[in-house]
Amino acid sequence: MRAPIPEPKPGDLIEIFRPFYRHWAIYVGDGYVVHLAPPSEVAGAGAASVMSALTDKAIVKKELLYDVAGSDKYQVNNKHDDKYSPLPCSKIIQRAEELVGQEVLYKLTSENCEHFVNELRYGVARSDQVRDVIIAASAAGMGLAAMSLIGVMFSRNKRQKQ
């Protein structure tokens, strides 16, 4: 039997499983979350809008978790609690509520929804998704470079034997 999803508590980070990425929000109580959304987002489109990757601005929104998640699964994921001390819950909520309605800078690689919620909870802006993509891209690049080098070495060796 699968364990039930724990009920979020104010200040919890909510990880929403979108088809190709994870969207993040912070739970502020009474069923609501605060999260970043593209300024052009239409109601019901959710943060899965492709426009989120194409704009440099976002709007801080307070919406029902049910509406933000839509049909996507979500979980409480305070994954950095062992590394960073969460700020007091009242401060997390206050900071989140103060930002609602504001337009903020949005960069997929340095100021995205995961950076935003980690900054609110821990005072540290970080995104493991971005780090993981950079590591994977670096590994792929090194793999291609190694294959190219091996190809050049075999090519030279073959020419020398002729």
Curated annotation (Swiss-Prot):
Residues 13-129 form the LRAT domain. It is a single-pass membrane protein. Its EC number is 2.3.1.-, 3.1.1.32, 3.1.1.4. The keyword Transferase applies. The active site is at H23, H35, C113 (acyl-thioester intermediate). GO terms for molecular function: N-acyltransferase activity; phospholipase A1 activity; phospholipase A2 activity; phospholipase activity. Keywords: Cell membrane, Cytoplasm, Endoplasmic reticulum, Hydrolase, Lipid degradation, Lipid metabolism, Lysosome, Membrane, Mitochondrion, Nucleus, Peroxisome, Transferase, Transmembrane, Transmembrane helix. It is found in: Cell membrane; Cytoplasm; Cytoplasm, Cytosol; Cytoplasm, Perinuclear region. The chain crosses the membrane at residues 134-154. Residues 155-162 are lumenal. Gene3D superfamilies: endopeptidase domain like (from Nostoc punctiforme) (3.90.1720.10). InterPro entries: H-rev107_PLA/AT (IPR051496), LRAT_dom (IPR007053). It catalyses: a 1,2-diacyl-sn-glycero-3-phosphocholine + H2O = a 1-acyl-sn-glycero-3-phosphocholine + a fatty acid + H(+); a 1,2-diacyl-sn-glycero-3-phosphocholine + H2O = a 2-acyl-sn-glycero-3-phosphocholine + a fatty acid + H(+); 1,2-dihexadecanoyl-sn-glycero-3-phosphocholine + H2O = 1-hexadecanoyl-sn-glycero-3-phosphocholine + hexadecanoate + H(+); 1,2-dihexadecanoyl-sn-glycero-3-phosphocholine + H2O = 2-hexadecanoyl-sn-glycero-3-phosphocholine + hexadecanoate + H(+). Exhibits both phospholipase A1/2 and acyltransferase activities. Shows phospholipase A1 (PLA1) and A2 (PLA2), catalyzing the calcium-independent release of fatty acids from the sn-1 or sn-2 position of glycerophospholipids. For most substrates, PLA1 activity is much higher than PLA2 activity. Shows O-acyltransferase activity, catalyzing the transfer of a fatty acyl group from glycerophospholipid to the hydroxyl group of lysophospholipid. Interacts with PPP2R1A; this interaction might decrease PP2A activity. Belongs to the H-rev107 family. This is Phospholipase A and acyltransferase 3. It comes from Pongo abelii. The lineage of its organism: Eukaryota, Metazoa, Chordata, Craniata, Vertebrata. The gene is PLAAT3.
